[in-house]
Amino acid sequence: MKFSCRAATLALAGVACVASSALAHHAVQAVFDVNKPITVSGSITKVEWINPHSYISLDAKGEKGQVQHWTFELAGPGALRSAGLSREDRGGLKPGDQVKVEGIAAKDGTTTGFLNKLYFPDGRVFVLANKDPYAR
């Protein structure tokens, strides 16, 4: 079987495209502004324990008293389970719980963020990300 230089080049180009897409997908700084830390307190409206990333949505009061709907991205269920939060009870979180979230804001200016630290109603603190966002 003859393997041409053209076929090898095309195969390598394909692998490079897939690899770069995977890296971009998993780079927090591709979507979130690591230089824009945020803290949001509010009432949980939804917990999505799904792959490849889980999400917590909450309603918080804006600067002018208006309700803002926030969504925070977390790691996937496997990583959350390893960190001590289970899918079965959604990490002990349920709609109506008052929580505080520390994270980084989305680059596009929407009310979305990447969760670094979650303060539970019972006083527990869950740390998802290292303080150095490039360490992920």
Feature annotation, model-predicted:
Residues 82-101:
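Short nucleic-acid-contacting surface segments enriched for D/E, G, S/T with interspersed K/R
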Residues 67-80:
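Short, basic/aromatic beta-hairpin or loop at an interaction surface
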Residues 40-44, 98:
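Conserved hydrophobic positions within beta-strands
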Residues 9-21:
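Bacterial N-terminal signal peptides
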Residues 1-11:
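Bacterial N-terminal signal peptides that target proteins for export
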Residues 23-38:
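Short boundary/loop segments of OB/S1/cold-shock single-stranded nucleic-acid-binding domains
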Residues 50-61, 68:
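Short aromatic-glycine-enriched beta-strand elements
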Residues 104-130:
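OB-fold/S1-family single-stranded nucleic acid-binding modules
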